[in-house]
């Protein structure tokens, strides 16, 4: 029989007592009263914050949005099919945040920054809040560097600068996404990080955009945040903020970023759905009262940072869809008042074969020529004026039968200028090519051609310049000025190419 030694037992007990520590963990817990339509009503959770993440028994997550006297309204980030009435909910003490890193470049993620492209996990050591405050007045400086879109109509007449917010607005099927994606394609080699946020779109449309980026080598500097039309309203509402948080990560590291929200009408609809289900009082068009704040707090995060903060920038191109060209609806007027200008795309122009279908008359950039290089300012000044006069004359010419020679010449010039603005999708032009194209048009070198020859002539002229006069592009790129030497080279090239072209056409 083993002899029990009291001193050994007492030392074991003493050790156990010394090692004992009493941990008190306070968890804020509530009970599900009701669940359905992506909304849960919770009893309890007394100390929950507005916007705090809460965790259900099935490990699904929700956001506490409505804090009422007797219950908490939570929006779910999933379908909520496994959440049962009476089950417990605990507050996490965290506000929605996402991991951020350089590893996100070239990836497709959802609104929670989780990869959905099947290429494995994304390594990240840093986190950013999805909703963070915008830079203040002292943290910013005025916009002065151009953000080239590669589209002649925009870069010459509605220029966009780094740190600007420019709205792209138009009816469905007018080429809004095409303008935005062309801008991303044009950032190749410009050292700009692009974020494309797809909200409530068909998954097939997003796949098409991602394929275009991949084929053109644009995916390596782009992050795609996608929430398809079948995603819960909560995730469609969060997606733009996730995109902004990813872009901010790069902006505060002294880099230039471009973010596209495609489109904010769908985000507003998702937010309206959530608000109505939470029984918040509806306002105009049944949107909640704070729908303006929904977009203003998002778009104010776009900025050009001051030199103390490293001069990084975040340029935002929000897209808004109109119904039958009605720009005076609630969401369009809200976003127009928040942004620094708008590019208006017209269905009539699109159907008339003018693509990109930009209505230059009512499109505007509130940054203006500050966002253009000197060479572009030198050649583009006359373009907008001549097009405006042409639009006026064209309306008048419909009623007048006999027009004098000067008016006929002006109409002919206007038709050729309008032809000059046409561009194929996914073929953005470098700024030196744009300068050459505009100069050719406004100085009457296209007047000798038929209208249907203009596009072909300009394509060939740009090729001719690249192969035979590479010094022209070099001067514009290095000096950013349309010098007398550059003008001389261009005039010579136009003269030589016109002779060749007319000989070809006569055969």
Curated annotation (Swiss-Prot):
Q: Where is this site: Required for activity?
A: 363
Which reaction is recorded as catalysed by this protein?
A: ATP + H2O + 4 H(+)(in) = ADP + phosphate + 5 H(+)(out)
Record EC number:
7.1.2.2
> Subcellular location, in the record's words?
Plastid, Chloroplast thylakoid membrane
Which example biological process does GO assign this protein?
proton motive force-driven ATP synthesis
Listed binding positions for ATP are: 170-177
Task: Extract the Pfam families matched here.
Answer: ATP-synt_ab (PF00006), ATP-synt_ab_C (PF00306), ATP-synt_ab_N (PF02874)
Would the keyword Ligase turn up in this protein's UniProt record? Answer: no
EC primary class? translocase
Supply the alphabetized keyword list. Answer: ATP synthesis, ATP-binding, CF(1), Chloroplast, Hydrogen ion transport, Ion transport, Membrane, Nucleotide-binding, Plastid, Thylakoid, Translocase, Transport
An example GO CC term for this entry is: chloroplast thylakoid membrane
Q: Check the record and name the InterPro entries matching this protein.
A: ATP_synth_asu-like_sf (IPR023366), ATP_synth_asu_C (IPR000793), ATP_synth_asu_C_sf (IPR038376), ATP_synth_F1_a_nt-bd_dom (IPR033732), ATP_synth_F1_asu (IPR005294), ATPase_a/bsu_AS (IPR020003), ATPase_F1/V1/A1_a/bsu_N (IPR004100), ATPase_F1/V1/A1_a/bsu_N_sf (IPR036121)
Mostly located where? plastid
**What PANTHER family has UniProt attached to this entry?**
ATP SYNTHASE SUBUNIT ALPHA, MITOCHONDRIAL
Q: Which family does it belong to?
A: Belongs to the ATPase alpha/beta chains family.
This protein's assembly is summarised as: F-type ATPases have 2 components, CF(1) - the catalytic core - and CF(0) - the membrane proton channel. CF(1) has five subunits: alpha(3), beta(3), gamma(1), delta(1), epsilon(1). CF(0) has four main subunits: a, b, b' and c.
Instruction: Tell me the HAMAP family matching this sequence.
Output: ATP_synth_alpha_bact
Q: Per its record, how is this protein called by name? A: ATP synthase subunit alpha, chloroplastic
Species of provenance: Physcomitrium patens (Spreading-leaved earth moss)
User: Gene encoding it?
Assistant: atpA
